Amino acid sequence: MSSDIHQIKIGLTDNHPCSYLPERKERVAVALEADMHTADNYEVLLANGFRRSGNTIYKPHCDSCHSCQPIRISVPDIELSRSQKRLLAKARSLSWSMKRNMDENWFDLYSRYIVARHRNGTMYPPKKDDFAHFSRNQWLTTQFLHIYEGQRLIAVAVTDIMDHCASAFYTFFEPEHELSLGTLAVLFQLEFCQEEKKQWLYLGYQIDECPAMNYKVRFHRHQKLVNQRWQG
């Protein structure tokens, strides 16, 4: 599938405080054309550095900052690190499943996660309607990877699924759990992609200066989009 795009019509937001680097301002470019909002076109846009929030497709377009680097993993070429292999070994008693809808206990887990990890963020206080508006869309297949410890739900990874790739959209988990559940969710998403024979798993944006985001480079065989060229 070609990753080339022709010129598309975009709109620019005003500058506002950055969600990841609070001392900086951010601005995003938003795809305005309705015919770009399809699964096939979104797959091409992902390959060109775009992401979605709800039904909105966007990419960073900041005046003087280029810290947000799109990052993806080549699924057929994945090489797990020693620490990732140890994590999977420790997680042998856990199970995961991909579902079209979230477990009925999702909101209690989501609330604990937001209160513990993102009390100063835009998603606090946690609200069901806000998360539904943020995570759902009308033109793309979105499923939910659930991780269980016995019968207890401990993590949910919202996952967008296209013909040749998947995109890790958002993950929340039991904040006090002893295992690195965010990393584990990506490992299970990679397993899903292998089963479904996907080429890429997109992880969003890598931000080196943001500790909450820079775990993504620990996955070997990743590529980053630099100057509109995938490198790695």
Swiss-Prot record:
InterPro entries membership: Acyl_CoA_acyltransferase, Asp_Glu_LeuTrfase, N-end_Aminoacyl_Trfase, N-end_Aminoacyl_Trfase_C, N-end_Aminoacyl_Trfase_N
Query: Which superkingdom?
Result: Bacteria
Where in the cell is the protein located? Cytoplasm
The name on file for this protein is Aspartate/glutamate leucyltransferase
Gene Ontology CC, one term: cytoplasm
What family, per the record? Belongs to the R-transferase family. Bpt subfamily.
Keyword match Acyltransferase:
yes
Concerning PANTHER family, the annotation shows: ARGININE-TRNA-PROTEIN TRANSFERASE 1 (PTHR21367), ARGINYL-TRNA--PROTEIN TRANSFERASE 1 (PTHR21367:SF1)
GO molecular function, one example?
A: arginyl-tRNA--protein transferase activity
BP terms from Gene Ontology:
ubiquitin-dependent protein catabolic process via the N-end rule pathway
Function field = Functions in the N-end rule pathway of protein degradation where it conjugates Leu from its aminoacyl-tRNA to the N-termini of proteins containing an N-terminal aspartate or glutamate.
What catalytic activity is recorded? N-terminal L-glutamyl-[protein] + L-leucyl-tRNA(Leu) = N-terminal L-leucyl-L-glutamyl-[protein] + tRNA(Leu) + H(+); N-terminal L-aspartyl-[protein] + L-leucyl-tRNA(Leu) = N-terminal L-leucyl-L-aspartyl-[protein] + tRNA(Leu) + H(+)
Question: What broad class describes the main subcellular location of this protein?
Answer: cytoplasm
Effect on the protein of changing residue 170 to F: Almost loss of activity
Question: Which SUPFAM superfamilies does UniProt cross-reference here?
Answer: Acyl-CoA N-acyltransferases (Nat) (SSF55729)
The effect annotated for residue 205 to F is: Almost loss of activity
The UniProt record lists the EC number as 2.3.2.29
Q: Which gene encodes it?
A: bpt
Q: Which UniProt keywords apply?
A: Acyltransferase, Cytoplasm, Transferase
Query: What is its EC class?
Result: transferase
